[in-house]
Amino acid sequence: HTMMGRDMVKETNLDKYIKNPSSGNYREKYYTYKGKLPSNEVTLYEDHDLEKGHFWNLSIDLTACTGCGECVISCQAENNIPVVGKEEMRKSRDMHWMRIDRYYSSEMTKEVSKKEDISSIKMYAEMEEPSENPEVVFQPVMCMHCNHAPCENVCPVAATTHSNEGLNQMTYNRCIGTRYCANNCPYKVRRFNWFLYSENDRFDYHMNDDLGKMVLNPDVVVRSRGVIEKCSMCIQKIQALKLEAKIKGEPIKDEDAQTVCASSCSTNAIVFGDYNNKDSEVRKLRKDERAYDLLDHLNVRPSVFYQTKVRNKQNA
């Protein structure tokens, strides 16, 4: 699996952004029997009815993100995610629900490869070599909670399903570990429990002793061996907020709805909220001209979206 060659990060410079707020944010069109259509209008799926009740969305501003990792650490602590160590990481058995992808600019570009008639394999190999003074982009990636989710329709036991609030849910005690969902996920954000980390002395980090277990979040289940896990959009916090609002007999306030990654972000790069709340910040951001979906050509309609990165260059 590689993400090379795909438009993961969309960016522009300040001068172009001032003239045109949608600069850098383009959507490709595809040939269909109805003519050329943008990717968000081409689909085989039936739409979910998400106009009633809540519709949870999350925005990530690439301009504001500094790649500090606060969101990853807070997610790790909040959701009882096991620490697996270097050896497992080398085997690509990481368990982080969030990751921060780093991209460095290179002297090799598609334009240069065409000019020099270089094969695509050699082009991508040379792209891995950063330039002497590279431009850097940090991109947090978690489960996108797609409304046309490729993972949901391949699970043979319906362990991953779609909620009426736009969330992609996991039923851990139904999962049989086929990993079809992880294979079919274009964002590669699903994690498989190769071991029972909480009871295995090999992973002597924080979970498998009496003192360490006191640190675990009692609102989040500790997953067992052989099941898939992923970002839940902090469903435990959402449910607690809904219960509190129900007891008080008042609607949920936009500022009260928070995932732990959003509340821990020191630059406010991550914003969470209810899209169906017409006054919510996340609704305003979704309608912003900088907003785009990761791998939007797939049209999986994610509930997580990004804001185009704006650079303030000297030659802008």
What is the predicted function of each stretch?
Residues H1-A316:
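Non-ligating segments of multi-cofactor redox enzymes
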